[in-house]
Amino acid sequence: MERRFASQTVVITGGCRGIGEGIAERFGREGANLVLVSNAERVHETAARLVADTGAEVLPLVVDITDEAAVADLYAQAEARFGRIDVSVQNAGIITIDAFDRMPREDFDRVLQVNTTGVWLCCREAAKRMVAAGHGGRLINTSSGQGRQGFIYTPHYAASKMGVIGITQSLAHELARHGITVNAFCPGIIESEMWDYNDRVWGEILSTPEKRYGQGELMTEWVGNIPMKRAGTPADVAGLVAFLASADAAYITGQAINVDGGLIMS
């Protein structure tokens, strides 16, 4: 695989599983230094696996991305270790599923704190350092198909991901003069732990006495609505993210690009 990102440093939040791990593996195979961020200790296991599989240098960090001081410290550590920050992928995210009239306020607030405020804090800190260094950079944010249109039992998640697109477009205007592009991607159904949870909980809520969903059945039904007739993989998403981080995407900014097999066409 071409080493397009040799000597570049890529920060990836939510990097120890699912889409984030797939993105990290892609950048590692293309020569980047990796800063792998998660709120879970398992990030160290993922980092060790990436070193073995890709040969990349990896700095694993356990960070709460809703903590402003902790976010500043993570970028300081990244810069101290590798000397610069070229790409920052704001991928950390959470979801809960419940009817809006039963949803605890704590769930609503926490989803927005992680999915939207966390993205803003990381973009802000990464951009400060990119501007100061004067070499431009790439900010890439994880939105969702629900950033395009809301869905049942997840109003807080939809709001959080629509907010990510708003942040992306606003910062794209503000940072263009510094040579920093800001884009988002909107995954659909992607094989991951999050979608295992989605399949189980949505399946429980949407089941009726006439039709009960077993494990995997709801996801299979929904995949049938995708023109390409399959769920996506983290590697499918990683290919787009690597493109947006590359020199080939230097004139692309402020965009939110669907990665969903054609489920949402816009």
Where are these regions (language model features)?
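Conserved glycine-rich Rossmann-like NAD(P)H-binding loop of the short-chain dehydrogenase/reductase
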Residues: 30-46
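Short, small/polar-rich loop/turn modules that mediate ligand/substrate recognition or access, typified
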Residues: 176, 181, 252-254
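Residue(s) in the substrate-gating loop at a strand-loop-helix junction
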Residues: 144
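Alpha-helical segment proximal to the catalytic Tyr-Lys
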Residues: 128, 173-174, 250
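Conserved glycine-rich cofactor-binding loop
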Residues: 9, 16-17
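Substrate-binding pocket helix/loop in short-chain dehydrogenase/reductase
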Residues: 99-100, 104-112, 222
